[in-house]
Amino acid sequence: MMSKSNQDIATPMNFIREIEIFFKIKFKYDMAANHDNNRVEYYFTEQDNSLEMDWPLDGWCWLNPPFGKLSQFIPKCKEQKDRGCRIVTIWPLSGDFNQIPTWKESFVSIIHGRIWPEVRGVMLCQWDLDTIKGVRGLRWDKKQLTYCWE
């Protein structure tokens, strides 16, 4: 599902549910949403500005940041993880992985298979104090997530 701007690509709801099933978690907060693309019970809009607040600690946070603000959300995720937040983020795969220091800060899952028509590849980063750091591959076939390599 696309909103009016490519900055606001909505994550397909069935993909969100599969992430919850796969990681055995339940998202409570969407940290970068709008009234048309929110995916969980509580969400924060651009006007709420989640970049300027402490994120909730009482549930898992989902983050699909606007493409134009990726670089602002990376340090925010690290800051909030260090506070104790449990976060799963989705990032577009790009040629420059040096811009995404999450390789050292989170458990990264490379997603094989298209989620949106416009985006060829994405990775999930699970920011959690108890998560083992590393990289694994997952396959998305429009119905479920499965391991394809670890």
Would you name each region that the model predicts?
Residues 1-150:
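Class I S-adenosyl-L-methionine-dependent methyltransferase catalytic core
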